[in-house]
Amino acid sequence: MEKALTQRDYESLADLRHHIRRFLHFSEVAVRGLGLEPHQHQLMLALKGLPGGTRPVIRELAEQLQIRHHSAVELVNRLSTGGYVQRQKGENDRREVLLTLTPKGERVLRELSLHHRAELRKAGPALFGALQRVMRSIKSRVGREADLPDRNGEYVRHVGPERRQTPSRAN
């Protein structure tokens, strides 16, 4: 890892952080305006956005939100009390607890998601531009061969303009 940073590096990182924070602030205000806390909204969105085949269980949501299991349980408890999510027993394993959004939860999440999407239409280009500047800075500093994430977040080695290969794990 390169250790030297330029003033431009700091400026581009600060600009990216600023645009991320602006969007997060928008989100917090929108969510609280509907009587929820940001983590509650994040859990509802994570639940609705789970990839197909992923079991909607607390362990999975805790991983998605990068929080501890007991914190996810508390969020689910509050959302359940508020009528936003419900627990159901698993069909094959009755010990398993599956989570679903209630109609109220679906309605509120849809409203928030529409607001977030509209805000991203406005703020997205500046956020994307800030991210591109940071990534260009990284790429220019490490040269033509660099491990950079693809659109799935997987790191791939870019070798010249035509070839891509997965970096070896033996580092």
Predicted feature residues:
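Charged, amphipathic alpha-helical coiled-coil/dimerization segments
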Residues: 77-135
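N-terminal leader segment of winged-helix/HTH proteins
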Residues: 1-34, 82-84, 150, 156, ...
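N-terminal helix-turn-helix DNA-binding core of bacterial DNA-binding proteins
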Residues: 25-68
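The N-cap/first-turn positions of alpha helices
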Residues: 20, 37-43, 105, 120
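Short, hydrophobic-biased segments on the C-terminal half of alpha helices
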Residues: 58, 76-77
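C-terminal regulatory/oligomerization modules of transcriptional regulators
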Residues: 1-7, 118, 129-171
